[in-house]
């Protein structure tokens, strides 16, 4: 008898083996095993039925456990490597300072309810609400702090491709866009009632973003919304009237993504024509084109002013642009597996190589030091802009399938009630906003940024959300 098993365990194993041979239509082998074991195993037909399938279940359980052990060992090795390369001082600083915080496994919450791939996520600028959209045609609203589903919004008739919070001063709205050719506006303060539907695009609407307001040269209100479509156009909408006030033409193929600059003066878009474009919102004209990708460009992002010193050094400049300037640097991610960082004139500064599949979404760290990316290779990567854009962290298997989106929770702005047009002492900037742009001249150890002249203070929220083809939304938080 094996020294590894007790007599009872050995008997159970033998019964399972005989039952397996009988179920596999191998009666001679089963009889031979019975004879070999003599009277040590009593197994009648009813008992054999009970043990049928037990051996296969045990086997698959062992395989699953082995995989889990390997995953845990890999994660443990990664954490040990991080500890070995860190000093007590740097660890303390990293744990306390949101400016240096990066996401790591495991996720704080795994949100499950969608029945088809998750395509997009978006954070409410003030509350702990997170919206997710899916190919299942629904939008789901979650409490990201509790990890609970709050409600399911139905209205679109095809896949929901993007969501974004923002809107007029005094009232945050949720915008969504879909393959059904429409954009819908929902009112969070009224049970997410559908208050307006914006038709006009001739094909799927890929992306939607509210345009921030308040800076010189930008729109005077938060009433504007930009959308990108497979019909090759960008459209700017007035959400109070529902009218399209401007159509931007220049792309020659599907426009996949669009972003608005923190002060609302510029737009950045890209798509299947492999070209990114920087637009002036007021004139509707293209200011710069960005050429170099070898496949469709899936995602775009404006670099926050906090990153200007690092990106200027990367570009070889002795002096960084002032933090009050807009759209100085941008980033693009492509199906060619690369990420590219550019200046506003379209000059390539750096190409980031590391992903093994399409790059699907980008998010700059509000502290300005890092760029985060997600990909169809199922990883989340963190690139350090102060170290020649070296990949300093990879969250492997962040999801079980292609990762389609990533968003960083908007900064909390202290003593800036004007952002929402009310008297609240704490508000948030969903897109960076003009107040955000003016509040980043100084950084204090708490992770808050403040204007030395007495302007508003911004607190970084160390929370990001990702969505995937695996039907899940994951929330990573400090």
From Swiss-Prot:
One GO molecular-function entry: dynein complex binding
Species of provenance: Paracoccidioides brasiliensis (strain Pb18)
WD repeats, residue ranges: 113-154, 156-196, 200-247, 250-289, 292-352, 354-393, 398-439, 440-477
Oligomeric form and interacting partners: Self-associates. Interacts with NDL1 and dynein.
Function according to Swiss-Prot or TrEMBL: Positively regulates the activity of the minus-end directed microtubule motor protein dynein. May enhance dynein-mediated microtubule sliding by targeting dynein to the microtubule plus end. Required for nuclear migration during vegetative growth as well as development. Required for retrograde early endosome (EE) transport from the hyphal tip. Required for localization of dynein to the mitotic spindle poles. Recruits additional proteins to the dynein complex at SPBs.
Domain LisH: 9-41
GO cellular component: cytoplasm; microtubule; microtubule associated complex; spindle pole; transferase complex
Gene assigned in the entry: PAC1
Domain note: Dimerization mediated by the LisH domain may be required to activate dynein.
Keyword Electron transport (UniProt): no
PANTHER family named among the record's database cross-references: WD REPEAT DOMAIN 5B (PTHR22847:SF637), WD40 REPEAT PROTEIN (PTHR22847)
GO terms for biological process, alphabetical: cell division; establishment of mitotic spindle orientation; microtubule sliding
Keywords: Cell cycle, Cell division, Coiled coil, Cytoplasm, Cytoskeleton, Microtubule, Mitosis, Repeat, Transport, WD repeat
Domain of life: Eukaryota
Subcellular location: Cytoplasm, Cytoskeleton; Cytoplasm, Cytoskeleton, Spindle pole
Family per similarity comment: Belongs to the WD repeat LIS1/nudF family.
UniProt protein name: Nuclear distribution protein PAC1
Coiled coil, from the record: 60-87
CDD domains, per the entry: WD40 (cd00200)
SMART domains cross-referenced by the UniProt entry: WD40
